Amino acid sequence: MTTNRFSFRNGWSQLPKNKTAEVRTRIMGALQLKTRNTFYIRMRGEIEPKVSEAESIEAIFKEYGITDIWGY
């Protein structure tokens, strides 16, 4: 598997299982995503995030003590 530097799967895999729905909802709101499919496309890094989007994603993960977010 190749590494995708725009993917935030690394951070996602560090989340406690009981927090994934909450974090998904928050990221979808921050990025104004309407469907889970678009969320997973973003999580896999198929679309490069804007700087403001990357900062939002980092801030959300940081609240859960996760700082190593990008790549997978």
Regions found by a protein language model. Give the residues of each.
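A short, Lys/Arg-rich alpha-helix, primarily the initiator
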Residues: M1-R26, I66-G71
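Non-catalytic effector/regulatory segments
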Residues: T3-N4, Q32, F61
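Alpha-helical residues within the helix-turn-helix
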Residues: G29
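DNA major-groove recognition helix of helix-turn-helix/homeodomain DNA-binding modules
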Residues: V51-D68
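Short alpha-helix boundary/capping elements
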Residues: Q32-T35, G65
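Recognition helix of helix-turn-helix/homeodomain-like DNA-binding domains
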Residues: K34-P49
